[in-house]
């Protein structure tokens, strides 16, 4: 399975000194030692990455290891724009995460933004053919890090 890692948990996933690292350590272990891959794309996500430069270097290393799948920025941006246009929920600021799920088919999001979770799982944002994602928010969800659920995008090297 691939995983979209919300930038709000980069420190927890990648920094062993983080107070919450043990909760997110299974994610990094699954990527390093299993078939897990990080999925990302879109202008907003890349801008958020730009604010987390020390983690950008880690992402580059994972890309060299074929552990990253980049989704077409234009497709993500277009879908994000549609979601934002149709959105009546003014509290939502993670349209880009939902757009990455839709464009990539990735079914797992790693986040600790509890206010975003209801929106990320909100069925009305997704086409009927798209499965709603599961949320990894801590060690209790490590059963979601299962190789048997690898999304098609993570089985190929090409960018969608």
What is the predicted function of each stretch?
Residues 1-3, 108:
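The start of beta-strands in P-loop NTPase/AAA+ ATPase cores
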Residues 4-5, 17, 21-54:
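PIN/NYN-family metal-dependent endoribonuclease catalytic core
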Residues 10, 46, 116-117:
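A generic structural signal for short hydrophobic patches within well-formed alpha-helices
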Residues 11-16:
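Short N-terminal binding/cap micro-motifs at the start of the first secondary-structure element
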Residues 34, 66-69:
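Short glycine-centered helix-capping/turn motifs at secondary-structure transition points
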Residues 52-63, 119-128:
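Short, aromatic/basic amphipathic alpha-helical patches
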Residues 70-123:
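Active-site neighborhoods of divalent-metal-dependent phosphate/nucleic-acid chemistry enzymes
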Residues 114-160:
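Acidic, PIN/NYN-like endoribonuclease modules and their adjacent C-terminal/linker elements
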């Amino acid at each position: 399975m691939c995983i979209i890692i919300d930038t709000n948990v980069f420190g927890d996933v990648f920094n062993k000194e983080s107070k919450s690292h043990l909760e997110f350590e299974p994610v990094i272990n699954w990527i390093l030692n299993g078939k897990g891959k990080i999925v990302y794309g879109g202008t907003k996500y890349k801008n958020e990455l730009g604010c987390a430069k020390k983690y950008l270097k880690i992402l580059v290393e994972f890309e060299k290891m074929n552990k990253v799948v980049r989704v077409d920025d234009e497709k993500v941006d277009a879908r994000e724009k549609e979601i934002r246009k149709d959105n009546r929920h003014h509290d939502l600021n993670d349209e880009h995460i939902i757009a990455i799920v839709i464009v990539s088919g990735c079914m797992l999001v790693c986040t600790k933004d509890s206010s975003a979770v209801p929106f990320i799982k909100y069925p009305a944002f997704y086409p009927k053919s798209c499965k709603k994602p599961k949320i990894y928010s801590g060690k209790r969800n490590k059963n979601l890090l299962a190789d048997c659920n690898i999304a098609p995008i993570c089985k190929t090297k090409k960018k969608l």
